Amino acid sequence: VKSIQRNALSAAVALAALGAAPVHAADFTIGLSNGWIGSEWRSQMIDEATAAAEAWKEQGVDVEVVVQSNNVDVPGQIAHVRNFINEGVDAIIINPNSPTAFDPVFAQAKDAGILVIATDAEVSSPDAIYVGIDQKGWAEASARWLAETLGGEGKVVAINGVAGHPANQMRVAGYQEVFGEYPGIEIVNEVNANWDQAQGQQAMQNLLATYPDLDGVWVQDGMAVGAWKSIMDESKTGDIAATGEIRKDFIDLWVENELNSGASVNPPGVMASALNVAVPLLQGRELLEPAEAGQYGNALYLDIPFIDGDNVESVAGDMDGEPGYHSYSSSMTIDQAGALFQPE
C-alpha cells in the first residue's frame, strides 16, 4: 500500500463539505463496524479491539473507538461507514459483509481523509487495506491436516458457514484446492450450517445417516462442536477424523475425549491487530513492506496458529478459567505491530 499520511487540513475541509462535525477530542477516533452478531466470536472481536485502544492510552496515545455492531445486510453496513464519515472519525476498521460492495463508500471515506482497514474478510477496494489472516490459507492448513490424517484417501464431507460471505467463499476455495491434490479424497457432500452450533449438529446427524461409512469431516468454527457431538452420539469418534475449532467448550471436549482433530486458528484478536496497525498509519509512519498480498493486492496477512494433538493440552491450560464460549485468541501487540513499520 502506498504511504498513508494524513493531512489534517484537507480532511477537515472534506468533512466540512459533508456537513459533518469532526471528532477531535481524542488523538485518534476509530470506528469499528461489525455487521453480524450471530456468534460470541464477533463480540470477543469487538471487546479485544476496544481493549487494544485502552492499551494505546497507557502509552500516551488517546485512541477512542466508536462501535456499530448489529445484524445488518450490506446496505445497512454501508450505512455504518457513512455514519462514521459524518462523525469525522480518523479511521474505520470493518469486518465486511461483502468483498466488493463497499468500493464506492470506501472511496468516499478516503476523500474525507479517513483510513479504512478491513479485517477477517478481504475487500476489493483500492482505498482500503486488509489486516487479518488469509482465510484461504486457514482452510488449506486444516484441509491438509485432514487429508494427511486420513492417509490421503477417504470419503469426506464439508460443513460450511454462511453462503456468499467472503470469508466462507475463500475457505471453500481453500479446502477444495487442497483436497483436489489428493486423488484418494472424495468430497461426497458440502452443506451450509451458517456458523451455528445447533445447525452444525443437525447437519452432521443428517450426513452420518446418509453416509454411514464416512471417514472425515471438514467443518468450520462453532459448528465443529455440534458436528463432533453428533459423531460422539453415533459412537464414531474412533472412526472419523474431523477438524475442530477454538472455543473453550470444544477444546475441553477435545482433551477429555481424545478426539482426532485439528484446528486452524482465526483469532478474534484480528480486529485488535488491525487497530494496532491503524494507529501508526494515522501517525504518518510507513510500512516496511507494502500491504500487497492476497487476491486484491491490498492485504497484510497475520500468522495462522494451528492446534492439533501435540499442543491441544497446552492450549486448554492457557484457557483455564475462561467461559465455554471464549475463543482461543492472539493479536499483534503495539510493539509487534510497530516492528512492521519504518523506524521513526
Regions found by a protein language model. Name each.
Residues 29-52, 56, 66-79, 89, ...:
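Extracytoplasmic "Venus flytrap"
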